[in-house]
Amino acid sequence: MDLTPREKDKLQIFTAGLLAERRKARGLRLNYPEAVALITCAILEGARDGNTVAELMSEGRKVLTRADVMEGVPEMIPDIQVEATFPDGTKLVTVHNPIV
């Protein structure tokens, strides 16, 4: 399988997001990389589903709460920026304070 570097990055994000989702489902509190991966994955999948940038900026704040992550993680993530592919092209989605 020949994948571009961008496609490889997306697969790594998806894999990390899937791992984070499983750990969250088991009741584990997520660390920094897991939290970022899960939110990023949700944004990428939302873009693939046809949601708008504005919708994803809002939905990105609903993926995790403080109770879902380890202490100090929300303060480590002031914002997340994801370059996502939409039906009309690639756009940058910025989610400010993604964990509230």
Curated annotation (Swiss-Prot):
It catalyses: urea + 2 H2O + H(+) = hydrogencarbonate + 2 NH4(+). GO terms for cellular component: cytoplasm. One of its GO terms (molecular function) is urease activity. Transmembrane segments: none annotated. It is found in: Cytoplasm. Its EC number is 3.5.1.5. Keywords: Cytoplasm, Hydrolase. GO terms for biological process: urea catabolic process. Pathway: Nitrogen metabolism; urea degradation; CO(2) and NH(3) from urea (urease route): step 1/1. Pfam families: Urease_gamma. Belongs to the urease gamma subunit family. PANTHER family: UREASE (PTHR33569:SF1). Heterotrimer of UreA (gamma), UreB (beta) and UreC (alpha) subunits. Three heterotrimers associate to form the active enzyme. This is Urease subunit gamma. The lineage of its organism: Bacteria, Pseudomonadati, Pseudomonadota, Betaproteobacteria, Nitrosomonadales.
